[in-house]
């Protein structure tokens, strides 16, 4: 069932998503080689709480084994939803950070991929094509289109035009 949101609800959703964006912007300022993803997660956790948000991933799951982190951080070939850890980031790493925040009872959630230092030409190309694919999908996120239309646009650009794979 689809629940239509009113203007006030949409504004609250926007504010939550904006705090996710601000958190990712804060992370962008500090990322560097030698830093651990566990440290980055702690920065994320504190920033969210300092801005009256609640990290929505933290504590998620069964009571016996809740997710312990404020974010999911994937480095290089870790596909998605990696756990922050004590491994140090290196020059050329690509780091995807996924953050969810509850603000005023509304969730905001998105991810961003960062390069640590100067990545290889191959990695730069992957990042470029991935970003282009995102925008191809966004172009198809219009009234009367389906999720499949968005997915097809992304897959077409990523796989058929550039030879990369899409995780399913």
Residue ranges of each PLM-predicted region?
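Active-site neighborhoods and metal-handling regions in enzymes and metal-associated proteins
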Residues: 1-168
């Amino acid at each position: 069932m689809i629940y239509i949101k009113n203007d006030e609800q949409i504004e609250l959703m926007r504010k939550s998503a904006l705090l996710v964006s601000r958190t990712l912007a804060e992370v962008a300022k500090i990322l560097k080689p030698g830093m651990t993803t566990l440290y980055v997660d702690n920065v994320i956790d504190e920033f969210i709480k300092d801005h009256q948000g609640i990290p929505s991933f933290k504590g998620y799951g069964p009571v016996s084994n809740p997710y312990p982190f404020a974010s999911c951080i994937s480095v290089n070939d870790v596909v998605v939803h990696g756990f922050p850890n004590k491994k140090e980031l290196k020059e050329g790493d690509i780091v995807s950070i996924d953050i969810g925040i509850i603000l005023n009872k509304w969730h905001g959630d998105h991810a961003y991929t960062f390069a640590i230092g100067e990545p290889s030409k191959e990695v730069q190309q992957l990042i470029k094509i991935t970003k282009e694919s995102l925008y191809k999908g966004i172009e198809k996120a219009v009234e009367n289109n389906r999720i499949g239309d968005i997915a097809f646009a992304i897959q077409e650009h990523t796989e058929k035009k550039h030879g990369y794979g899409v995780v399913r």
